[in-house]
Design a protein with these regions (language model features):
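Short, glycine-/small- and polar/acidic-enriched structural segments
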Residues: 1-133, 138, 151-155, 170-178
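Predominant activation on well-ordered alpha-helical scaffold segments within soluble catalytic domains
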Residues: 18, 64, 118, 161-164, ...
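Pocket-lining segment of extracytoplasmic ligand-binding domains
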Residues: 61, 140-229
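Small-molecule pocket liners
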Residues: 81-87, 179-184, 188-189, 263
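Secondary-structure end/capping motifs
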Residues: 194-275
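Conserved C-terminal helix/tail region of periplasmic/extracytoplasmic solute-binding proteins
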Residues: 264, 268-303
Length: 303
């Protein structure tokens, strides 16, 4: 059994990662994966480069920014290519659709999630029509809406249900093509030296996705018992989180072109240095392609 580190950049990845781990999907491929801890963007680059971390779950913007300076980051697989967000507002706000955000304050969280909101609003033609601001303190950004500190926020499950229970109105909006959530990331020197571990890591991810999609009750149980980042989940919230994630998880974890285009755009918004990196330069799907061509992934779904 080979030990590898696979820290996440956001604890929102954990509902999926807990299922991959607890289903034995990595273990089946001879890997003992240390996945249940967070890593900063800075430490991701430093620790992958010095070999103390083999893989990182995520890190979606800084690699585009750092590549012109010689960074060797590489993306090997992408579990989702859609951001499954909803708009939440106060019930008496008069907001019923995205265009109603004109003149309103929209609360966000974090750098990448905040830029997702920025891009969605930009694509809706509202960039100079509303104010996007990170929620203050440690509260969830939907709580800023509840408390009257903002007019709206974009949230992902289970926060939509939690918002509704707090009296907010949940508005369905189109999902945004985006590279986010669990991406299998590493450094090119490690990947070239350990192709066999890369192969097993990706097989474990594919196996975990298949288990998630085909073992509903078991996956919901794991999520309910182990995912605590947004408080204890009951049956309704755990089931909703599962069902929504199941819809967007990709059986074959290739990033879509619209998702890559959008993450590239927000990386440039964060730092213009990213313009010097080609949007496709960080992606290497040939390890996944070999697994796919072998029939391994298709066989996971054959009964």
């Amino acid at each position: 059994m080979d030990k590898v580190n696979f820290p996440y950049r956001s604890d929102s990845h954990l509902p999926f990662l807990h299922v991959v781990h607890d289903s034995g999907s990595w273990e089946k491929h001879g890997l003992d994966v240390n996945y249940d801890y967070e890593i900063s963007s800075e430490d991701s680059h430093k620790n992958v480069a010095n070999g103390t971390v083999e893989f990182v779950g995520g890190n979606h913007l800084s690699p585009y920014i750092r590549r012109p300076a010689g960074d060797k980051w590489v993306y090997l697989g992408q579990t989702v290519s859609l951001l499954n967000h909803r708009l939440v507002v106060r019930a008496d706000s008069g907001i019923n659709k995205v265009s109603d955000l004109k003149g309103k304050k929209v609360a966000t969280k974090g750098k990448h999630p905040g830029l997702n909101t920025w891009l969605f609003i930009k694509q809706a033609g509202l960039l100079n029509e509303c104010h996007v601001e990170k929620a203050k303190g440690s509260k969830f950004h939907w709580e800023a809406v509840r408390d009257g500190e903002a007019d709206a926020a974009f949230v992902t499950p289970p926060a939509d249900i939690l918002s509704k229970r707090a009296g907010l109105k949940v508005i369905e909006v189109p999902f945004l093509p985006m590279v986010w959530f669990t991406t299998v990331s590493s450094g090119l020197p490690f990947v070239e030296k350990h192709a066999e571990i890369v192969d097993r890591m990706l097989r474990g991810i594919c196996e975990g996705i298949a288990y998630f999609k085909t073992h509903r009750a078991e996956s919901i149980k794991i999520i309910k018992e182990k995912y605590k980042a947004e408080g204890d989940l009951d049956d309704e919230t755990a089931t909703h989180l599962y069902e929504d994630l199941k819809k967007i998880l990709q059986g074959k974890p290739y990033a879509t072109i619209p998702a890559i285009a959008n993450v590239y755009e927000i990386s440039i918004e964060q730092d213009r240095a990213a313009e010097k990196t080609d949007p496709m330069a960080l992606w290497d799907f040939h390890y996944l392609r070999r697994i796919d061509d072998s029939g391994f992934i298709d066989n996971l779904y054959r009964t």
